[in-house]
């Protein structure tokens, strides 16, 4: 039986698997999280008999014969369950986050806005990794790490080569699972070398937007009020708009600055950000 316990925010998550392939997959998916000696709040168990079952705290979540299918189900339930337990102590923002000079920079936006691409570029340039999807805002204005692996939906990425990722010290992992049509899909995971395991004070909030028609990146600074009106839509746990706005205003430090960047080339976007904000 393979076992491990890791921490996220103020909770611990326990994993155990009787299935060897599932254990390898779970180890890769959770490898960037720091070990914890706390009693787990959430315990995911994979059991093997005639088929394979996945359970959370004793309640069955999924059952099947394909280990990749079990791994895919685990990954979905893992992130949803963690966020559910962390809120409201932590506010989970749909945003990537990196550490720059021991301060947190958040890239918030909808899917395909380019936040993961900019996050990846910053990591290639030596920044510290906190998250590519879940930025956990504390009541003291810090971002807690949620370092799940970077994940490519395809074998290749339009902006980054495998060699670029490897040159930055990133390790590679993957798992395979059947899609809804029964076709085998490979999830390619990248494991950054520089991972931040302690919370960092939030300093920059950036709203990226990818636009293929833009000739050169455009960076603008926006008012705090404008940014706060936009941020609630990016919270994973929705509630009344006025309550979300009040919570964000109380938690985000007064010295934080807010920006938009419009870009079609992530490498040029990073050059502009570095020169304008991080020099």
What residue ranges belong to the model's regions?
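Post-Walker A alpha-helix
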Residues: 118-119
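Long, basic/Gly/Ser/Thr-rich N-terminal segments
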Residues: 1-74, 81-82, 86, 270-279
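Short, flexible segments with low predicted structural confidence
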Residues: 69-71, 77, 93-94, 223
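Conserved glycine(s) of the Walker
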Residues: 113-115
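Glycine-rich, often acidic-flanked micro-motifs
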Residues: 3-28, 39, 96-109, 124-130, ...
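Pre-Walker A adenine-sensing motif
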Residues: 85-100
């Amino acid at each position: 039986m393979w076992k491990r316990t890791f921490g996220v925010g103020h909770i611990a998550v326990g994993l155990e698997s009787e299935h060897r392939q599932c254990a390898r997959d779970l180890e890769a998916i959770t490898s960037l999280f720091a070990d914890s000696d706390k009693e787990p709040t959430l315990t995911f168990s994979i059991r093997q008999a005639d088929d394979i079952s996945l359970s959370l705290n004793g309640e069955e979540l999924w059952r099947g014969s394909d280990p990749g299918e079990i791994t895919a189900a685990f990954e979905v339930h893992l992130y949803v369950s963690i966020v559910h337990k962390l809120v409201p102590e932590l506010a989970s923002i749909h945003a990537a986050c990196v550490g720059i000079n021991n301060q947190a920079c958040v890239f918030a936006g909808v899917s395909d806005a380019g936040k993961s691409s900019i996050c990846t570029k910053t990591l290639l340039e030596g920044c510290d990794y906190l998250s590519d999807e879940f930025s956990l805002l504390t009541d003291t204005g810090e971002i807690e790490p949620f370092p799940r692996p970077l994940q490519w939906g395809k074998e290749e990425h339009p902006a980054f080569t495998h060699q670029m990722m490897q040159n930055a010290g990133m390790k590679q992992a993957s798992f395979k699972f059947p899609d809804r049509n029964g076709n085998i899909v490979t999830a390619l995971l990248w494991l950054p070398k520089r991972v931040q395991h302690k919370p960092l004070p939030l300093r920059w909030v950036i709203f990226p937007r990818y636009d293929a028609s833009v000739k050169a990146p455009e960076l603008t600074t926006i008012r705090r009020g404008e940014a706060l009106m936009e941020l609630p839509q990016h919270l994973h746990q929705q509630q009344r708009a006025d309550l979300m706005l009040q919570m964000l205003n109380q938690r985000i430090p007064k010295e934080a600055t807010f920006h938009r960047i419009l870009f079609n080339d992530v490498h040029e976007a990073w050059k502009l950000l570095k020169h304008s904000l991080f020099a």
